[in-house]
Amino acid sequence: MSKRTFQPNNRRRARTHGFRLRMRTRAGRSILSARRSKGRSQLSA
């Protein structure tokens, strides 16, 4: 039996996909603006 690949960890989740990480780069900011224009209720992790 192989182990499950998803091992939940909220801190790691926020640090790799979080809002502040998205705001750091130009590409990340474009992702956020795209999600805003689409009307997503949750912008990032």
From Swiss-Prot:
Pfam families: Ribosomal_L34. InterPro entries: Ribosomal_bL34, Ribosomal_bL34_CS. Keywords: Ribonucleoprotein, Ribosomal protein. Residues 26-45 are annotated as: Disordered. One of its GO terms (biological process) is translation. One of its GO terms (cellular component) is ribosome. One of its GO terms (molecular function) is structural constituent of ribosome. NCBIfam families: rpmH_bact (TIGR01030). HAMAP family: Ribosomal_bL34. Belongs to the bacterial ribosomal protein bL34 family. This is Large ribosomal subunit protein bL34. It comes from Parafrankia sp. (strain EAN1pec).
